[in-house]
Amino acid sequence: NFNHAKGETRSFIQSSANFWLDKFHFDGLRMDAISRAIYWGGDPARGVNGYTVEFIKNMNKGLQERHPTAMLIAEDSTSYPKITAPVEYDGLGFDYKWDLGWMNDTLDYFRTPPWERCNHYHKLTFSMAYFYNELFLLPFSHDENVHGKATIIQKMYGDYEEKFMQCRALYMYMYTHPGKKLNFMGNEFGQFREWDENREQDWEILHYPIHDAFHKYIKQISGICCSRKALHC
């Protein structure tokens, strides 16, 4: 871990983040596993690292002033409060919190056989018990498409055709659930091969009617989501 008590460390990280947004025009930045930094050694029992908390607040406030359209996202699975509250209200100042709980519960539900789902409905409803504590982002990200985890379409229950039907239901649920949406490339046309940074996506599968139809479906519901303020605010 970085020693955020040192000025040179803070300067290096802040300058790097600003450089990525300024020169490469990234849409935003995700800070990975922030609990490892917020708590000493990543252990809540050891208490909060005040140097790190102060650093995150100052960095986020500065980045938002310089890059007001960039999204600053925190990946965190703990209950540390005010992740997305403004710094002025003693928050960390992130725009969104990566909702790992929603992602894991949702994917578990859709890989469960339909006749068993009546015993797992809480996986769809639990997110609303905490959802308004923060501003959440719903992620189907690169993390779920690498290292033998299988792609989103592969995770669905059923045979080849059933997986596409399940995946349509999955995305309709995602797009109508409160929160910002994030969908990793390849998911939108049902790619079965995991992501490989050394290869481009398997665009040729769009010649198959079932993949092409799924791609058009995602395009259509994305348009509906973007055109209706209640679905994307």
Where are these regions (language model features)?
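Alpha-helical packing segments of well-folded alpha/beta enzyme cores
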Residues: 9-20, 55, 59, 167-170, ...
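Substrate-binding/active-site clefts of carbohydrate-active enzymes
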Residues: 1-48
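Conserved alpha/beta catalytic core and glycan-binding cleft of carbohydrate-active enzymes
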Residues: 25-27, 39-198, 205, 223-232
